[in-house]
Amino acid sequence: MDELLFPFCGPDDILYSRCQIDPELYEYLAGLGFSFRSRYHFDLSDEKKHLPEADVFKRCMFRLAADQTQNQITADRMLQAVGSGYPEATGLAEMISPKHAAGGLHREAVWTHTVKPLTPYAITADTEVYLQAAGPFSPLPDLETVVRVNSKIYSNRLLARIGEKCYGMEANSAAEMESAGNTLLKQGPYLLKDPFGVSGKGNLLIDGEAMQRRIAGHLDKQERSGLRSQFLLEPLLRRGTDFSSHWFIRENGEKDFISVQRMMNQQQNYGGSIKADEALIRLLEHAGYFDTMEKALGILAEDGYHGFVCFDSMILENGDVVPIVEINARMSMGLINAYLNKVWETHGHTSWLTFLSLGLPEGFAFGRLLDALRVSGLLLTVQEGYGIVPLSSNTVMVNDILTSRRITDGLQSKRGMPKGRLYVSVVGRDNEHRSELINRLRQVLADLSVKVYN
């Protein structure tokens, strides 16, 4: 999914990814005006190279890059000792579009001995390792701060700190969970939330005392073995509209508003993002939503966080606004859509970012999808047009490529149907037109014998 960060890149920026972006997709995006340099760690299509071990392949990208950088530094020192003119920064393979082939290395040369900006999707435990190995970089918030503000416990307490209604109840043991749950069940079902669950994962709907007793019993056994419980319990609210607001907190505490995105959720899970219309913005202004966000952003800055932040919010069926459902102290899918829209909005268009979960037939290649979209007239080929923009290749192909390589190497016997996920920007005149485009995309995939599961 690291490929999805290309909308944040300028022509001289480098997008680091785990696997090589499909060259046809890379050239297609460059033709649309998304010009960037690409470096990658693995080229899975190169059958001359051994497949990486699973534990190596799944390592955090920061760890992979840090190890590569450290190995490169060691190699440079050895070569310099014997007078070699070994070039810098050759640790990761690179793709350069024709536009950069002649002189695209200037900016990196300038950055070699200065502080470089680093913009990760999220800060992880391995970020500090990479900063030390490959820096200097512009400052990032420390991991402890990021973990704390990402917790649903933090966001629940934040609501109290700024004087807003708190819907959640904290529970730090099985007994506390059962006690708080009994109170909530008098009003109806409730959600038992993992403080660090992402995109609805980690939420469990409790609809009765019998189910609650089973969960509490399981937690009690874990606690007696030495583990600790922590959950947030929230009533199952009658939601009307899910949306998110996106901001950037500067290191000095100044706040920049980026966008409000309406979320197309499927039950508790993320299903897509589209820019909020003027009617929703006016409703939020009238409800004091943006004043509440200013207070929340101020607290985040006071607590040491800076960088991109997303507030998941909702409007209930009765019209009440719940300003903070959770905080995502990182980039987000809605933010990616907001940056894509910076391109489409110059032509008066709006993008819907969504995805399709796929099952791939034998012999499928990403280039076949691009060709089929082009032949059908669905592929958006000019910024001022309408159509489908595929955003990533490896989310679609990585499992298929790994499966094929393992079968070839005798490590696997049955292919099954490898799964993938196709992220797309659907650029249309209005909601009806965008729905028509996504339905046509489904038909193109069906014609390619690709199964769509959602």
PLM features: residue spans?
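ATP-grasp fold ATP-binding core
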Residues: 159, 184-205, 223-239, 311, ...
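A long amphipathic alpha-helix within ATP-dependent nucleotide-binding catalytic cores
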Residues: 269-318, 359, 364-385
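Glycine-rich phosphate-binding loop of ATP-grasp-fold ATP-dependent ligases
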Residues: 168, 190-215, 243-244, 267-280
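Histidine-anchored nucleotide/phosphate-binding helix
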Residues: 2-10
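Phosphate-binding site of ATP-dependent enzymes
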Residues: 214-265, 315-323
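ATP-dependent carboxylate/phosphate-activation module, predominantly the ATP-grasp catalytic core
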Residues: 240, 247-297, 304, 328-355
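Peripheral (often C-terminal) accessory segments that flank ATP-dependent C-N-forming ligase machineries
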Residues: 346-454
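Conserved N-proximal alpha/beta basic substrate-recognition cap immediately N-terminal to
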Residues: 4, 17-179, 183
